[in-house]
């Protein structure tokens, strides 16, 4: 039986990547720092995944073990030495942390097992595997870099599946939406293509990453930030508000124009894709908390992320002003959550310098740019019309 090493035993790791690895015939070793989850994995050796829908289909995942990377670093190294594939679902900020363990494992692997290995970062970001590779290679001696490039692939991936916040009777069980997408860049794979059910291998990943980021993530941000501003608790509740409905269709029309111009997507097919995405947010069987989806506003207001980049692309390709994307950016600037470190930091910036300067600082936009002016205009409208 093939072995997969997966970093991140959270809901996404178990409910999305772990499920597909099992369905592909892998035994999976979950690596995490959460001792309770790792203990339960080793105790139960299986868990259930439920598809959020009327029938709540139940799927069982077997052949799993867990390693606490803090308590058993040598076991992590040994697992990487013997692995057939390595995947991650830890969050973008944790990739530099796990890179040290992966680097150590790969260095030991070159001594014991001279076979190729692919490491696929399944993160909500552009270029996750490439970033992970940079951090893995940081600790290498110069003469080892060529060998690592020859043996180890870091193909970038685009992943998409809504896994809401949840509390289940069994700690390991997880509910996910039925829809998923996992696209991997084929040209960066070393050796044989990993035979994983559900992966679509493509030659050029960029269009798929940006289509997902600027449709799914952009779209999800709208009921999250506007929903919070308007007093809603869940995405499903927020999606019933006509003001939010109007904004999401408008914003995804703007980001869609940018994507069609940039990558030549078929207009009719892209509109069908947008409609499917909006229907996912309206799924009554997934109750996702608006504040969970909205967390990390500084990262999400970044120059290359889901709100600012499609807005700038829209301006560049059409010469028009992205009203609905600007409105969403404004709502993100208003987001306040005492349990979110980035939200606290953002509000401190705003208190110190004002909304305009804070936006300029986190987005990289000029203070007199078209987008900045429109964002501040929309922000004032939101403040006055709540």
Curated annotation (Swiss-Prot):
Amino-acid positions noted as binding NAD(+) in the UniProt annotation, renumbered to this chain: 4-15
Reactions performed catalytically: D-mannitol 1-phosphate + NAD(+) = beta-D-fructose 6-phosphate + NADH + H(+)
Entry EC number(s): 1.1.1.17
Disulfide bonds: none
GO cellular component: cytosol
Main enzyme class: oxidoreductase
Keyword terms, alphabetized: NAD, Oxidoreductase
Single GO term (MF): mannitol-1-phosphate 5-dehydrogenase activity
Pfam families (UniProt xref): Mannitol_dh, Mannitol_dh_C
Domain of life of the source: Bacteria
Gene Ontology biological process terms from the UniProt entry: mannitol catabolic process
Family: Belongs to the mannitol dehydrogenase family.
Name of the protein in its database record: Mannitol-1-phosphate 5-dehydrogenase
């Amino acid at each position: 039986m093939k072995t997969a090493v997966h970093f991140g035993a959270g809901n996404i790791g178990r409910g999305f990547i772990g499920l597909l690895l099992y369905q592909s015939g892998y035994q999976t070793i979950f690596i995490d720092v959460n001792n309770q989850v790792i203990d339960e994995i080793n105790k139960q050796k299986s868990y259930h995944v439920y598809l959020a829908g009327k029938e709540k289909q139940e799927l069982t995942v077997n052949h799993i073990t867990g390693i606490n990377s803090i308590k058993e670093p040598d076991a992590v190294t040994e697992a990487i030495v013997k692995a057939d594939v390595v995947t991650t679902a830890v969050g973008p900020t944790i990739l530099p942390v796990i890179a040290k363990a992966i680097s150590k494992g790969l260095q030991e692997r070159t001594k014991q097992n001279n076979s190729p290995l692919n490491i696929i970062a399944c993160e909500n970001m552009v270029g996750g595997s490439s970033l992970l590779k940079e951090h893995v290679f940081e600790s290498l001696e110069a003469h080892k870099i060529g060998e690592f490039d020859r043996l180890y692939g870091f193909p970038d991936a685009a992943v998409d599946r809504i896994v809401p916040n949840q509390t289940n009777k069994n700690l390991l069980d997880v509910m996910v939406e039925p829809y998923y997408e996992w696209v991997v860049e084929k040209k960066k794979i070393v050796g044989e293509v990993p035979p994983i059910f559900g992966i679509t291998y493509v030659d050029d990943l960029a269009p798929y990453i940006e289509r997902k980021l600027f449709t799914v993530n952009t779209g999800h941000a709208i009921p999250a930030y506007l929903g919070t501003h308007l007093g809603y608790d869940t995405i499903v509740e927020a999606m019933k508000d006509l003001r939010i409905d109007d904004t999401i269709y408008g914003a995804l029309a703007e980001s869609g124009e940018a994507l069609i111009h940039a990558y030549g997507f078929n207009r009719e097919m892209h509109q069908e894709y947008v409609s499917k995405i909006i229907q996912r947010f309206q799924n009554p069987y997934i109750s996702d908390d608006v504040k969970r989806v909205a967390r990390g506003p500084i990262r999400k207001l970044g120059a290359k992320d889901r709100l600012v980049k499609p807005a700038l692309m829209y301006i560049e390709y059409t010469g028009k002003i992205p009203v609905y994307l600007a409105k969403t950016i404004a709502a993100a600037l208003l987001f306040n959550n005492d349990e979110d470190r980035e939200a606290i930091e953002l509000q401190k910036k705003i208190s110190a310098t004002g909304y305009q300067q804070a936006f300029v600082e986190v987005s990289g936009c000029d203070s007199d740019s078209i987008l900045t002016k429109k964002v501040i205009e929309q922000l004032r409208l939101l403040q006055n019309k709540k």
